[in-house]
Regions:
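Short, structured segments at the rim of ligand-binding sites
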Residues: 1-417
Length: 417
């Protein structure tokens, strides 16, 4: 890629990765057909599709519509080689226990951003009556009599554990009460999807969710909402280049914390006919401190992308990472481009205002890779981001996405489906 001045143009934001994946896991609960419209064609979705196919699910694509026929599940084992590259594979724990009353699944993988233990998932399944055994590299679960509703209070708010408990609760006998739930928009979208499938759920969007097993599950057609992190990435790329862009099909309510920081830096935006119109020409103010927090706080997935923007802003800014301990590993790569960042524990001090210069850098995880693209678009000269496959896990054709906004960018090898 090459810095080419301010980004300008309009893009339609893709469907949400973090909403689509749990919906795909939920599809196996029902002995029927599930159709997802606006489903992103990205590497993580393709990997989840391959896992479902290995279980016996028939799938078909038409543009951005994914059809999943789950009438016949032939297999309840998912080997480690299919799960170690994607964290969301653990969501099949709750849905497969609900459907088949047993599962054998390899430990999930994903981005190397820090410890993400599955103990909260396993404890929730145990409280619902499943017998869980952990062997080297595998989790084995059984519930011969089926799952039972339970009162589960999560020790810490966890998106994945909340999703797994919701999936298990769809078929569990009686009522299930979840407390200290994650409140991310993707949790809310999953609840609405499960309601469409037939589950009775109350408390959507709160930290306390009540649900009762579905009397009967039914076929579902559902539209995946837009991806708030992709929208935030485009917005912050415009901020880094002082551009003016329009983002179609976004919900600003899901982006409040991201937009608040954007405004503090001097950016302006408005909603007009369902389109977010952003003018970043006035970006010039550092931010005193931004701390990543569970929703509705500032998302950890946007932290490294914000860091890339702050390097272009004169003055000193601070970021505190409270979620994952390895989310500052991008600093070494940004320094190759001339960025000045000092890290102490969970705190990073960004000394911004110097012109970044193009360099060969290496993506180590999804959002850090996207941040390097944002930095490269604001840099002088040409930049090369190695291991772009990390970026393609969450961004559909990133070269086309940023190309529509005037960026000079290309990918040498691309994930296709």
């Amino acid at each position: 890629m090459r810095g080419n001045g301010p980004l300008e143009g309009e893009v339609k934001v893709q469907g949400s990765k973090n909403a689509a994946l749990p919906m795909m896991a939920a599809a196996v609960l029902h002995e029927g057909v599930t159709v997802l419209h606006n489903c992103p064609r990205i590497a993580d979705v393709f990997e989840m599709e391959a896992i479902l196919q290995s279980l016996g699910v028939k799938t078909a694509w038409k543009d951005h519509t994914l059809m999943m026929d789950c009438k016949k599940i032939r297999e309840s084992g998912i080997p480690g080689e299919e799960t170690r590259t994607m964290r969301s594979s653990i969501l099949l724990l709750g849905s497969m226990l609900g459907r088949c009353k047993r599962i054998r699944i390899g430990y999930p993988g994903g981005c190397t951003i820090g410890a993400r233990p599955v103990n909260l998932h396993l404890e929730a399944m145990k409280k619902m009556g499943a017998e869980i055994r952990e062997t080297e590299g595998e989790i084995c679960g059984e519930c011969p009599e089926g799952l039972s509703g339970a009162h589960i209070r999560f020790q810490i708010s966890s998106v994945g554990a909340t999703e797994n408990a919701l999936l298990a609760g769809v078929t569990a006998r009686g009522e299930t009460l979840l407390e200290n739930c994650a409140r991310e928009p993707e949790i809310q979208h999953l609840c609405c999807f499960l309601q469409a499938m037939g589950a009775e759920i109350r408390g959507i969007g709160t930290g306390k969710i009540w649900m009762r097993r579905a009397a009967a599950l039914r076929d579902v057609e559902y539209t995946v909402p837009s991806d708030r992190i992709v929208a935030g990435t485009c917005l912050y790329a415009a901020a880094a280049t002082r551009g003016q862009i329009s983002l179609k099909d976004v919900d600003p309510r899901e982006m409040r914390s991201v937009l608040t920081v954007y405004e503090k830096m001097g950016g302006q935006w408005e909603m007009r006919s369902g389109t977010l119109r952003a003018n970043a020409a006035g970006i010039r103010f550092p931010v005193e401190k931004v701390s990543t927090m569970p929703y509705p706080g500032f998302p950890t997935d946007m932290q490294s992308i914000l860091m890339a923007v702050l390097l272009t802003v004169p003055g000193e800014s601070r970021i505190e990472e409270t979620i994952f301990e390895k989310r500052f590993q991008i600093v070494e790569e940004l320094e190759k481009m001339g960025g000045r960042v000092t890290v102490s524990g969970r705190q990073a001090v960004i000394s911004g205002g110097r012109q970044l210069t193009g360099a060969a850098v290496c993506a180590r995880e999804l959002r850090g890779g996207a941040a390097l693209v944002v930095a490269g678009l604001s840099a002088q000269g040409e930049s090369v981001v190695k291991h772009a496959e990390y970026i393609e896990r969450g961004y559909e054709h990133p070269d086309q996405l940023f190309g529509q906004l005037g960026a000079v960018i290309r990918i040498r090898e691309q994930v296709e489906k």
